[in-house]
Regions:
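Short aromatic-glycine-(Arg/Gly/Cys) micro-motifs in beta-strand/loop hairpins
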Residues: 1-6
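A glycine-biased, small/acidic residue-tolerant capping/turn segment at secondary-structure junctions
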Residues: 74, 297-307, 335-342, 351-353, ...
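Alpha-helical phosphate/pyrophosphate-handling elements in metalloenzyme active cores
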Residues: 75-127, 244-287, 323-328, 376-409
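Short acidic/histidine-centered micro-motifs embedded in hydrophobic/aromatic stretches
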Residues: 103, 123, 140, 211-215, ...
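Divalent-cation-assisted or electrostatically stabilized phosphate/pyrophosphate-binding catalytic cores
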Residues: 144-184, 235-255, 279-282, 304-330, ...
Length: 409
């Protein structure tokens, strides 16, 4: 039994899953005067959320200020409107990567609260928003973060013209996507501008910029593989996707972009040595792989409302995941069944039920879950042996691992 204790009363929940649900319904103000007892993983999870909610408040305030500075009133109205679309997408993220930058920064126990990490965190969140804008074009997605995507927003606006010309529909989509590319590009360079204007005099500026560029390059390399693999498998006479292929996407696109990169940026800002950063990057690699496996499991079995995107999009996009590669390598007959749905748009609920059933009965879901848990456990074990991270922040990192395991979106 896990105890949730504050000044006035005590609440008991049965397990970490219940604690996670309870925390999600609370807020940072409520959590400040509360402690959790009875289970180490629960205590670690709670420590992470207390840290995360604090950083979330700071980042939301900072991103609002940054977003307001994006608007240049001397710009053409069309540019101002486009910039407002960037701002619309740049303000409602989960800020997990920003929190990892803060965690990497504070993990040296600098005994200060000077928020030096904030411009770095907001620049990274702006980069993330920008690459997701491009990702939405690549995936032909209509929803992101529970909102319509930028191309869809423009497309809806163009529809109001009631133009009936023969090529209007095709041109409308092309222009909407083109604007999405332009706005994503704008966000990339605004993120760079934030970094340069805030850290040009920092003694670690070159290290920050080099690492930031490495993260961006790795992410784009991973995206290239992620785009080509499903197309090649679906339409070209090439060998089937293997687990090694999938792991290469996970390494470049997710492990670096979502976990290794942001935490390492915070460490550079805190002036950790290159050797210490390399050790943490090796540790965080497994965590990044586990993070993506969880994402892919949620992409099939998650709740659409919580995910903020279509629950069938991974299947419609013929996305190559560890679930898919497991069946491709182990069960040709079930792969044939899976191909009835993979790459098909507008899948019905019963279609997705059949996909879920295939992944479950073949053991693909269990296989993916077991690897994910192994990655998380390995990260925890290695973390115990790291001597240069402050113990308080080790607990928060451990809590973050538990969060990744139990998250539902």
């Amino acid at each position: 039994m896990i105890k949730i204790i504050n000044d006035k009363n005590k609440i008991e929940v049965e397990d970490i899953n219940e604690l996670y649900k309870w925390i999600k319904n609370e807020n940072s103000i409520t959590l400040k005067n509360i402690k959790v007892e009875g289970n180490k993983k629960a205590e670690d999870l709670f420590a992470f959320f207390k840290f995360y909610f604090k950083i979330l408040e700071e980042c939301k305030e900072s991103i609002t200020d940054i977003n307001n500075n994006f608007i240049d009133n001397t710009d053409n109205k069309l540019v101002v409107d486009a910039t407002k679309e960037l701002i619309r997408m740049n303000k409602d993220g989960k800020f997990i990567r920003a929190a990892l930058i803060a965690l990497g920064y504070y993990s040296k126990n600098l005994n200060n609260d000077n928020k030096e990490y904030l411009p770095l965190a907001t620049a990274y969140e702006t980069f993330q928003t920008s690459i997701l804008i491009h990702d939405d074009i690549i995936d032909n997605a209509d929803l992101r973060r529970g909102k319509i995507t930028i191309p869809k927003s423009y497309s809806n606006e163009f529809e109001k013209s009631n133009n009936n010309s023969k090529d209007f529909h095709q041109r409308k989509i092309h222009i909407a996507n083109s604007l999405g590319i332009c706005i994503g590009d704008l966000g990339f360079y605004l993120a760079s501008k934030i970094l340069i204007s805030n850290y040009r005099d920092n003694p670690n500026f070159d290290r920050i910029l080099n690492l930031y560029n490495t993260i961006v390059i790795n992410t784009i390399k991973g995206e290239i593989i992620d785009v080509l693999l499903p197309f090649n498998e679906q339409y070209c006479d090439v060998p089937r996707t293997t687990e090694d292929d999938v792991m290469e996407i996970y390494r470049l696109k997710t492990a670096w972009y979502s976990i290794i990169g942001p935490f390492s940026l915070g460490m550079v800002l805190a002036n950790y040595s290159d050797e210490e950063i390399k050790k943490m990057q090796e540790l965080l690699y497994n965590l990044g792989i586990g993070f993506q496996i969880k994402d892919d499991i949620l992409g099939i079995f998650g709740d659409e409302k919580e995910l903020g995107k279509s629950a069938s999009s991974d299947v419609s996009e013929f996305k190559q995941t560890i679930l898919y590669s497991y069946i491709a390598q182990n069960n040709p007959e079930e792969l044939e069944n899976l191909h009835k749905y993979y790459g098909v748009e507008d899948l019905k609920e019963e279609d997705m039920d059949n996909v879920k059933d295939i992944f479950t009965r073949t053991g693909a879901r269990k296989y993916a879950t077991d690897i994910m848990e192994s990655m998380f456990n390995e990260t925890r074990k290695t973390l115990d042996n790291i001597k240069f991270i402050d113990e308080k922040y080790k607990q928060i990192i451990s809590g973050f691992i538990t969060y990744l395991d139990f998250r539902t979106k």
